[in-house]
């Protein structure tokens, strides 16, 4: 007797090619569709079809679809599964694709592929029919025994699970309600099997063969459950329910034939993770949190989104260096040598590092200081932080804070958010692997602020030695000790740093370099570095110190050495071109007449000194080594000089004075120009001035008007009222640059005094200081940078407030020798020093008055 399955499929089916899994009759699978042919199938057949027949597909397993429909169709698997598309979900991220929920109906065999584009369609033959066995009792008994044996193992497997779980109870009812012929396919799709084993079950057309192949799979799962029950400790009822819901996915098979290696490796990783938690040296609070999270992780299916989040959290917790630290090198003599070799000058900074080492020798549990290096760009603030770590023998990590405007970058995100991650502090500790590194917080003065919070406020806890031993990152949600971390912040100015944050840091000023210091730095560090980067040797290029001085004074004007480094790099590139061309010419000369070449070389070598690069421009022979970089070579390589000493030319008429200004880039000289014309007594100020500088200008003109008779200052009409029918225009050149601050007061007074007296201000004098309405000169900041700017500009005398005299101690000795300093407490002293011959009080012969 034979019977045919009631499921009838069309004789022609569109084919869905998949390699992610194997769909068996009676089971349901979710698959992603993103290849060209499969996308065409979904769009043309499923989304536009209106009949039930249009939703039936032929699913071909173990067959990847080519990415492009222009490629040939790969060899198709012989047996497939007719499936009903139950659900179609589309998405455009990260690329256009569909997710299909399909239910297997029956097996089929491909008879012939009818067409391949836009999607394959094949003529198929249905295979799932009830077979007619030979009419012998032996065969019937054999099939009956296989069926009973299969059913017995299936029931035994289900009864080992918790029947109170609805999913298990439903599976038990299915065993009693479904035909025995359908159970092998359904149970194979439920229990833990590999794709290869499912493919073998799919290819088993004979029902007897499917029974024989499925029974060993059931036995394996039963043995695995027994082993799990023996080795697993008693759990709470909730644990049993979770095991019962996903019983087969969690057991480890013992036959060794399972090829689902990803899940095995994942389970092994969880075991290793649990072992790391037990053996870690994290604090008790963190350990409790990890134990709680690992218990939750074991209960979760791997398909849950929270599974990956929890696992990432636990991996971070075991990787953090809770108690792992490096041993400090406390040899002060060796540290001094190392700092001197790495950096020239910076005596104040080196002194502070050596003091820290000395205190560490006396007290081992000293908390790390919070240092902040403040200075112009290019003076080596970042590199000196690396040298400090090298000196101490610690790990170094740099955190760039420029432009950071989200406090979560410091404190991390809470784990409730999608894509949450720890902050930069915790990430840095994970990277270095120790709990006492040197952290460089670069550009702390350029932190931003946004709706996501203020990162500067988040740094208050990090940079407070009294609080950072219990720093709590939002992602970790447990305290981490940062007290052993040596934090070094860098900034160009303290003006933009919040006061609360500034109060927590020890400020160390790193001023700009003098010309002599730049020359030493260039020949000790910059030139050797550039030679190495460009593949040159000292035997190929010679840069005298006088050439370096020319580069510093005529091609760069900065407090640091970055521009100097770039200019030296340009020189090395030009020399590299000459050297490479010379090698090419030598190769040509080797093939020419040797006698002629020797004669030419004797002619060229008449002068044995190193030749300049400009002398070798038109030679047919390779240049002689070393190539000398002189003034002419600089002009050929770098072009005409960018800066000239034009101070004396700009002070060739009255009404011009030189002031000194401080910027985040270092000190600068600043010209002040004044002119007068007939008018209505108005004061015009130009040059992008701030409110403070405008007030200084009004103060200056008021003081001069009140002392005009004393100094015999008159306007063009001979009146002591300087603004009577007279307009004054004050201009500060470099109008595109915003200027503000009180230190230009003395310069404005001197400029206006020169204008109304008709006398020239000395061209070699610069000045700085704040003024009052009574004519007092008040102290200002940035004296060292301002003095260095005057020295760079070639000036000879600097006028500063008397109360700033103490700041001259930080000026290098060679600069103090080149400059003379005048300390002034009032404007009378300033004017006397600014003009040749002084600016003494003038008196007119008094008129004889009589009462008669």
UniProtKB/Swiss-Prot annotation:
The lineage's top-level taxon is: Eukaryota
Question: What is a biological process (GO) this protein takes part in?
Answer: regulation of fatty acid beta-oxidation
**Where is it mainly found?**
other
- E.C. numbers: 3.4.21.53
Q: Return the broad EC class.
A: hydrolase
Chain positions with N-acetylserine modification: 2
The UniProt keyword set, sorted, is: Acetylation, ATP-binding, Hydrolase, Nucleotide-binding, Peroxisome, Protease, Serine protease
Per UniProt, subunit arrangement is: Interacts with PEX5. Interacts with TYSND1. May interact with enzymes involved in beta-oxidation of fatty acids, including ACOX1/AOX.
What PANTHER family is this protein classified in?
Answer: ATP DEPENDENT LON PROTEASE FAMILY MEMBER
Q: What does this protein do?
A: ATP-dependent serine protease that mediates the selective degradation of misfolded and unassembled polypeptides in the peroxisomal matrix. Necessary for type 2 peroxisome targeting signal (PTS2)-containing protein processing and facilitates peroxisome matrix protein import. May indirectly regulate peroxisomal fatty acid beta-oxidation through degradation of the self-processed forms of TYSND1.
Q: What is this protein called?
A: Lon protease homolog 2, peroxisomal
Organism the protein comes from: Homo sapiens (Human)
